[in-house]
């Protein structure tokens, strides 16, 4: 019997033009069936972390999926194993939602099989955007493009799924829909890492949460243990109260800045 899917991240470093963006990021092993939320203030390196794992920026260190070195994968190997959703799709593309999803599935939108179309349409319908399948991406709203980007990220069935702020432009109903899809993917045996700004949403859906701050991992663990008044003051520089709902999940109430000078210095 094969061992469960595992992602290892050790001493991950990324620099842009000589400026360090991630400084020796290490995490406990991540396992199949887990949805990991990645949170932190603006500029903490969350998007860069996902891009490094996806092989979209140069990085050093150790990133291994089932013992295989992700940082050395070819483009085709990466496409096979990693589904990546960026913060936004290009706004000027004339591909339809269906064509873009087929391109993500097969590498191009031409010469696809009927079974490919069925698979792509099933994913599109599951995300609630079936009526948009034949519309060009440039005609869509920001929220609709996010859902189209999610379809492209998950259509291959990759074992590792990376979602960069997938709910930032969505209303409450579509936020639930996206997070429910992310949870479903994890429950099917994938590893799903989601960048979120909403800690309450992270606590509702994630098995564990990683907090990035000042280019490093500040804390990691289950949301109920990690999210605290002290964490919010140290990382986000706010006075806040963490309370727990009847299901034992934390939610956050922000009362104001902990220090106006500190808040301004982080922007």
For each predicted feature, which ranges?
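Catalytic Walker B motif of ABC-type/P-loop ATPase nucleotide-binding domains
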Residues: 161-165
